[in-house]
A protein has these predicted regions:
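Bacterial N-terminal signal peptides
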Residues: 7-16
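Positively charged n-region of N-terminal signal peptides that target proteins for export
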Residues: 1-3
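Signature for phosphate-centric chemistry
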Residues: 24-104, 110-347, 351-457
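Short, solvent-exposed loop/turn segments at the edges of secondary structure
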Residues: 5-8, 378-380
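Sec/Tat signal peptide C-region and signal peptidase I cleavage site
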Residues: 19-23
Length: 457
């Protein structure tokens, strides 16, 4: 097992060279941004047959195969990245329009279809005049950067007996905390949600991570699918009712206009009392399984919590997130073995929600996330590491960005273009009291210390 870890250490060795000299000037200057982005809106990864096993009622039909980026997902990404370029322009990193200078963008995507197509949509929105290209892993099998355990780069996560008990306790607490949402899912879908659940810890040589099976896994997956449906067919979903304002104050005129369109009477969706004689009625709503956006957001914490518990768990995060975090850090420092990434003002990795959860778990980063559950990663979410230079040195800062819910729940191009991105500034571990950032060398050292974790397993 140790030889696997030594392969990963080779990636981390790129952090060791001396960090270049500090920049001149008093005002901090944004020198570089490294982004880890989730792919855009996709269809469920489950097959129609798998979805049919969850409920006797039909599900809406998608016009792409399971797990593929949809046309609407690509559209949302284009608008999101058009806005993001304007934000970077305001910060002085890149020009607001025109063809990008050669070498200013390094875009690397996981090789599967939904991430590659997401990268294409990102380019179309960010630099429609050209000036960028998409890079992917050329070898056989899965990309070791995004799938280090499955590809064999890193060993399977090994959980101690205490860590296993802790995970089970967290899942039990989740079931108590989200009892109302789980009951709602049970009434929507039927007995599949009520099946017992179990955690499966990987054996050495299986190239797997920790997995959840059973009713709680079904509930978690279904909660995500219901949200994806709302984002794919927002008009249809909003016809079911629900208020999606999320309690935000000081809305812009364009956001107020959006919410006037989206607001509707209280949901016509009500859950009958569950009884022993009739634990799961065949129908709660007529027609395909679908809920309003408000209901979807109330159910989503089931999925977000399961994701957090499994993917942020230390052994899982180390095995699955350490190589990617090491590469991102080395690019910030300008010491990676990829000269194009070192020289680029903006580096973007297009991966998956699990990648963001793994890296955020290693850095102990958390976000409130507005209308969405805390720490959740809606389609297109971005975990951003930025490098700021001043006469006092180089500082790394972190933030979380995503498209606004108002943009996700409209088909109006004006709204999608004009509603600002949702942003949260995050606090890095060991950060100073101002701005939540860390000196670059201290941040690199902190990442290096993470290598001690799997070496002890």
């Amino acid at each position: 097992m140790r030889r696997f870890f030594m392969s990963a250490l080779a990636l981390l060795a790129i952090l060791l060279p001396a960090i270049p000299a500090e920049a001149d000037g008093d005002a901090p200057r944004l020198a570089k941004a490294v982004i880890l982005c989730r792919h855009g809106l996709r269809s469920p990864t489950q097959t129609p047959e798998e979805l049919a096993a969850w409920s006797h009622r039909p599900w809406p039909e998608w016009n792409v195969t399971p797990g593929e980026l949809t046309a609407r997902g690509a559209e949302l990404l284009r608008f999101q990245w058009t806005q993001f370029r304007q934000e970077l322009a305001r910060q002085g990193l890149l020009p607001a329009s025109g063809k990008l200078k050669e070498g200013s963008l390094f875009l690397y995507a996981d090789k599967n279809s939904r991430t590659r197509h997401s990268a294409e949509a990102i380019l179309e929105g960010f630099t429609p005049e050209g000036g960028g290209e998409i890079r992917t892993h050329k070898g056989k099998g899965q990309d070791p950067l995004f799938h280090p355990v499955h590809s064999g780069l890193m060993p399977e996560p090994l959980f101690s007996a205490g860590e296993r008990r802790a995970l089970m306790q967290e899942l039990e607490q989740l079931c108590q905390r989200e009892a109302k949402a789980l009951s709602c899912l049970s009434r929507l879908l039927g007995p599949a949600v009520e099946n017992p659940y179990s955690l499966h810890f990987p054996a050495e040589g299986t190239r797997r991570g920790v997995t959840l099976k059973g009713g709680l896994h079904t509930a978690s997956s279904a909660a995500e699918v219901l949200l994806l449906q709302c984002l794919e067919w927002p008009v249809r979903a909003q016809s079911l009712g629900g208020d999606v304002d999320g309690g935000r104050a000081n809305l812009s005129p364009i956001e107020e206009k959006t919410l006037q369109i989206l607001r509707a009477p209280a949901p016509n969706f009500s859950l009958p009392a569950q009884t022993e004689q009739e634990p799961c009625p065949d129908a709660v709503l007529d027609g395909p399984v679908m809920v309003s956006p408000r209901t979807a957001l109330e159910l989503l914490p089931v999925h977000a919590s399961v994701q957090d518990i499994l993917q942020r768990a230390r052994p899982q995060a180390l095995s699955s997130g350490l190589p990617l975090l090491a590469v991102m850090t080395s690019i910030l420092a300008g010491t990676s073995p990829l000269p194009e990434a070192n020289d680029a003002a903006l580096t973007v990795f297009v991966g998956h929600d699990t990648n963001i959860a793994n890296v955020a778990g290693l850095l102990d980063l958390h976000w409130q996330n507005g209308e969405f559950p805390a720490d959740s990663t809606p389609p297109g979410s971005m975990l951003c590491l930025t490098l700021w230079e001043s006469a006092q040195g180089k500082v790394v800062k972190a933030s979380f960005l995503r498209q606004s819910l108002a943009a996700m729940l409209t088909t109006d191009a004006e709204i999608m273009q004009d509603v600002a991105l949702y942003r949260e500034v995050l606090t890095l571990p060991g950060a100073d009291e101002t701005g939540g950032g860390m000196a670059l060398d201290a941040f690199a050292d902190a990442v290096l210390t993470l290598t001690e974790g799997p070496a002890q397993n």
